[in-house]
Amino acid sequence: MALTQEDIINAVAEMSVMEVAELVSAMEEKFGVSAAAAVVAGPGGGEAEEAEEQTEFDLVLTSAGEKKVNVIKVVREITGLGLKEAKAAVDGAPATLKEGMSKEDGDEAKTKLEEAGASVELK
């Protein structure tokens, strides 16, 4: 009686991780192949390409620093928030101040906040 593909899958599903690793090693030896070669042959660089193509950034305040009042002023200027909301955002760091910014606008806002004494990231 021949084993079906489903029987093999069920048998592998019941194995421990160590047993599966041993099975893979035995198959590599039997058929003269390497499991690592299959990984290399797969499509690669998908995440790197996406990172290069990113056009919208989020401005994230990671820390207000020593000069919190100056940072609040710049946050109000960049976001258009009122004093109370800007203070809450600065006190609640890390906080996303603005989403979907262009690279140029994000860099400009980041520079202003860093000059005011804040720590900022563009994500």
From Swiss-Prot:
GO cellular component: cytosolic large ribosomal subunit
GO process annotations (BP): translation
Gene3D superfamilies on file: 3.30.1390.10, Single helix bin (1.20.5.710)
Disulfide bonds: none
Feature: compositional bias, Basic and acidic residues: 100-115
InterPro entries: Ribosomal_bL12, Ribosomal_bL12_C, Ribosomal_bL12_C/ClpS-like, Ribosomal_bL12_oligo, Ribosomal_bL12_oligo_N_sf
Region listing for Disordered, in residue ranges: 94-123
Domain of life: Bacteria
Listed transmembrane segments: none
Modified residues (N6-methyllysine): K84
HAMAP family for the chain: Ribosomal_bL12
Subunit structure: Homodimer. Part of the ribosomal stalk of the 50S ribosomal subunit. Forms a multimeric L10(L12)X complex, where L10 forms an elongated spine to which 2 to 4 L12 dimers bind in a sequential fashion. Binds GTP-bound translation factors.
Protein name: Large ribosomal subunit protein bL12
Lineage: Bacteria
